[in-house]
A protein has these predicted regions:
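Extracellular/periplasmic helix-exit of transmembrane alpha-helices
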Residues: 337, 763-793, 848-861
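Membrane-embedded alpha-helical signal segments
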Residues: 1-327, 345, 464-565
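Membrane-interface interhelical connector segments
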Residues: 337-355, 776-804
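Hydrophobic transmembrane alpha-helices that form the core helical bundles
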Residues: 622-658, 678, 812-834
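Hydrophobic, membrane-embedded alpha-helices of multi-pass small-molecule transporters
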Residues: 572-591, 602-614, 633-643, 665-672, ...
Length: 893
């Protein structure tokens, strides 16, 4: 038991510290205090600083008649090595007319006693070398010392990694000694371009860290940023890799890690070959590498030691396991409580009978079962291995069997929980994220059904898409999309095809470089031997920073720095097209029009009229927007955001919706949209590009379920009214105007034909896809009682009673992106008009809700006509401004 005096300083330091310096100042003084010429003075000072520590060995010796002292730390060096390599040669040394400085100089220059021979100059250097396993020689009359590297402390041998098992790979793992780990890497990578730099971190622990990289492949910018982060890291002690990772990940709001850890030397060598940077830390067997992509959580070493078809099968199993582990309990709770129509009658009856005798609600029951599992798992981990496994098995069997037998827990719920927990073991790198968000999905599913699960899923997706590691998005190569790198993401091609051609152009191992989206420099890094193929053509990129936010101060008041940095970036044309397509799809999903040949012709005519309206905006997109134009654009985006809210809740009125209070549901949706806005335009753009294929697959499944019940002649049936009336109605719906206006706002001021061509191509593709959807799928929409694709009472793709909840998920995901885009642009217009306003985006969200409430109160459900006039004015104003400027110049002339 420690005494009350255990944590206090020694008495000889109390007065000095209390009068002149703090503990930190004392540490700095010791580090900087130089050695003295007298041996007795140095020895007494060392004893004073050491405070009588028992493991400091002081051995007085005489070398060539000079009084010397050999200092070492017990247990940190090899006794046989120091006796044979240091003491015996020193005892045999006879140097005539020897002095202390000359003796140390002769030993250092003429005698090879050890390979590593640092020269301590201060008392801090002496203690640092002694504690690192060196033997330090002090000589009388010398104001410096000489150290010999004779380390020989006990260490764990090289063993098989415990956290990363494999079948056909190597069975060597890192140890706790950094120099041993360096040798494991060097033995596999004998290239001269492999650089391993040692440095010391930690004010108290003085831990050795090793920075590893391939000098011909690493990005100089990435390497410099990592070095700066390590230099700014102020830690007293470093005991594991978990101490360093937060400083390399920079932000705490990220859900997923941007740095990876591995216990395997072969895995780390493959990362170094990809141009990554690795960090070895003394005292831990886990090496850090960065940056890390999200898809790497589903890749293992065994994927490259088996046939490609089996690797693809296993990889898809991992993707499926991730979604099951994360979503299965929440979806089960949501369906059982809010969407029982998704189940067929037999399954619904079984679940009803199982839950009939349960004393708690299903949400409480689900959370209780998961909490019980987490307690048992934690107990099994913390207990000794001989007892932990037995305790886990016994506790699981006894508690689980007793709970089911007594009726506290239903059998289906226990089955769902066991399946979710088991699938979570397939992806151990994501175990922490899965564990926490599994509970959150249960809460959201129990409170708001699949609507709540969709909102929480959007929060995770937006956070994932906004996460970058030193400018590299971790969602690459999915967003931004890189076709070459996709060959080893969802599939896995053969190794012969991977290594065909230039080995530096590895399709997947360099996916993070192919998809570089540097923070502020999109063309990124063009190094002579690294990342020269990562440059992305800039002709198809649309610049946001030089448009609406052109005259904002460098860092607007109230605008988060992350948002400002994202505003100054560029987004890719494919992501822009995904946003426009989802906006158009949302408008089409919510359109309550009986589609027919007349309606198809009306849509074509309406698209032509809208193109004429947008023509002035396209022609004047390179002109700096004036404040009146920004005000009109802001009004349009607020109006359209409110209209999207009304469309969403109009759809909700026709399907089974778990949130009955529209205002509360709108507040939830607005909160998620504002979160996406705060993360920046890149988060929205990447999320849209990831949602687009998901939306296509879901829509195909739903339409296949309804296709057999549709009559093809409905497409040619008259819907009532003339072609002009159909065009007028479609024009009032403002079909693709939001996407077109959004494209125009991202046009750079410096006009480029390639940029205008990309804009027109995206507009044409969006309109063409929409019209083809009407023409091909219109026969399905002609028979439904709800809006076009809302086939809740019509489609039964999985033999369900009704499929309303699936449409709720689709509408929520697409509606979140659509409304978030409008809020972002409305907030940007507000920031343009009022640069000193602290919360422009929150004002945009509140304004959108007020507009939606006002339109609902006034019955203005089709407000697109107002948007037409506003956009028309937005095109006329710059033209008038330009003409007025030319007239003034002529008058001045």
């Amino acid at each position: 038991m420690l005494s009350p005096e255990a944590g206090r300083l020694r008495p000889e330091y109390t007065e000095r510290i209390g009068n002149t310096m703090s503990r930190k100042d004392l540490q700095q003084t010791i580090e900087q205090e130089p050695l003295r010429p007298g041996l007795e003075a140095n020895l007494s000072r060392i004893k004073e600083i050491g405070g009588g520590t028992s493991d400091l060995l002081i051995n007085p010796v005489r070398v060539s008649g000079i009084p010397c002292v050999l200092l070492c730390c017990e247990g940190m060096l090899s006794t046989a090595t120091i006796t044979e390599l240091v003491l015996h040669p020193l005892m045999k040394l006879h140097l005539p007319d020897a002095t202390g400085p000359r003796l140390l100089e002769h030993i250092n220059d003429e005698m090879l006693l050890s390979v590593d021979r640092p020269v301590p100059l201060t008392f801090g250097d002496v203690f640092r070398t002694i504690n690192s396993g060196f033997a330090v020689l002090l000589a009388d009359g010398a104001n410096h010392a000489l150290a010999f590297g004779v380390q020989g402390y006990d260490k764990r041998g090289i063993d098989e990694p415990s956290s990363e098992g494999n079948v056909m790979g190597a069975h060597e793992g890192f140890t706790e000694v950094v120099r041993t780990n360096m040798s494991l890497i060097r033995r596999r990578m004998k290239s001269p371009v492999l650089v391993q730099q040692l440095f010391v971190m930690g004010e108290k622990s003085r831990t050795d860290l090793c920075l590893c990289y391939m000098s011909d492949r690493v990005s100089p910018r990435l390497l410099e940023q990592i070095r700066q982060d390590l230099e700014h890291m102020q830690l007293e002690t470093i005991l594991s890799s978990g101490y360093v990772r937060p400083f390399l990940e920079r932000r705490d709001w990220r859900i997923f890690h941007t740095t990876g850890t591995t216990e395997r030397p072969d895995v780390l060598c493959s990362k170094l070959l990809e141009g990554r940077v690795a960090l070895l830390i003394d005292g831990t067997p886990f090496a850090i590498f960065l940056p890390k992509l999200f898809v790497e959580n589903f890749q293992t070493l065994d994927d490259y030691t088996c046939k490609p078809y089996y690797a693809v099968f296993v990889r898809w199993i991992k993707y499926l396991a991730f979604f099951l582990a994360l979503l299965l309990p929440g979806i089960y709770t949501a369906i059982a409580l809010h969407h029982p129509e998704l189940l067929n009658s037999t399954l619904l009856q079984l679940l009803t009978e199982a839950e009939a005798n349960a004393p708690f609600s299903l949400m409480t029951e689900s959370i209780g079962v998961l909490l019980m599992y987490e307690v048992i798992r934690e107990a099994g981990i913390r207990l000794p291995k001989a007892v932990g496994g037995a305790v886990s098995i016994v506790a699981g069997l006894i508690i689980g069997d007793a709970a089911v037998s007594s009726g506290f827990i239903s059998t289906p719920l226990l089955t769902v929980t066991a399946l979710s927990v088991t699938t979570g073991f397939v992806i151990p790198e994501l175990s922490h994220e899965i564990t926490v968000f599994r509970f959150l999905f249960i809460l959201c599913g129990g409170l708001w059904g699949l609507f709540g699960i969709s909102l929480l899923g959007m929060v995770m997706l937006l956070n994932l898409c906004a996460t970058e590691a030193y400018g590299y998005p971790i969602t690459a190569p999915l967003a931004p999309f890189a076709p070459r790198a996709m060959r080893d993401v969802l599939t896995r091609i053969g190794l012969r095809r991977m290594q065909t051609g230039n080995p530096r152009r590895h399709p997947t191992k360099h996916a993070w470089r192919l998809c570089t989206v540097s923070a502020g420099i999109f063309s990124a890094i063009s190094h002579r031997n690294s990342l020269q193929y990562a440059s992305i053509p800039a002709s198809f990129l649309c610049n946001l920073s030089k448009n609406l936010l052109a005259h904002l101060p460098h860092k607007p008041c109230g605008m988060p720095p992350a948002l400002w940095r994202n505003c100054m970036n560029k987004i890719r044309s494919g992501q822009l097209f995904a946003i426009c397509f989802l906006i158009r799809s949302f408008s089409l999903l919510c359109t309550d029009i009986p589609f027919s040949a007349v309606q198809l012709g009306g849509a074509v005519l309406s698209a032509t009229l809208q193109g004429l309206i947008l023509l002035p905006i396209l022609l004047t997109a390179g002109i700096e927007p004036s404040k009146p134009a920004s005000c009109l654009f802001g009004a349009f985006f607020l109006l359209w955001g409110g209209h999207c809210f009304l469309q969403l809740w109009g759809v909700a009125a026709g399907v089974t919706f778990p949130v009955h209070n529209k205002l509360f549901g709108a507040l939830l949706l607005t909160g998620v949209c504002l979160y996406g806005v705060q993360l920046g335009i890149h988060a929205l753009a990447r999320s849209a590009s990831l949602l687009l294929p998901l939306f296509g697959v879901a829509l195909a499944v739903l339409l296949l379920g309804a296709w057999s019940k549709a009559q093809p002649e409905n497409l040619y049936a008259a819907a009532g009214g003339s072609l002009l009336s159909a065009a007028w109605k479609d024009l009032c719906e403002c079909g693709w105007l939001p996407g077109a206006a959004y494209l125009c706002r991202f046009t750079p001021f410096r006009p480029r034909r390639a940029v205008y061509g990309a804009l027109l191509a995206q507009l044409g593709a969006t309109v063409l896809v929409s019209l083809l959807g009407i023409a091909v799928l219109g026969r399905v929409g002609a028979q439904v009682e709800f809006p076009f694709f809302t086939l809740g009472a019509f489609s039964q793709p999985f033999a369900t009673q009704r499929a309303d909840a699936i449409y709720v998920v689709l509408f929520t995901l697409i509606g979140t992106i659509t409304i978030a885009v409008q809020l972002y642009l409305a907030g940007a217009c507000i920031a343009r008009l009022f640069p000193k306003f602290p919360y422009p985006f929150y004002a945009g969200g509140a304004g959108t809700l007020l507009v939606a409430w006002g339109m609902h109160s006034l019955g203005l459900l089709h407000s697109g006509l107002f948007g037409v006039w506003i956009l028309l004015l937005c095109g006329i104003l710059p033209v008038g401004q330009q003409l007025w400027g030319q007239l003034r110049k002529r008058r001045m002339a």
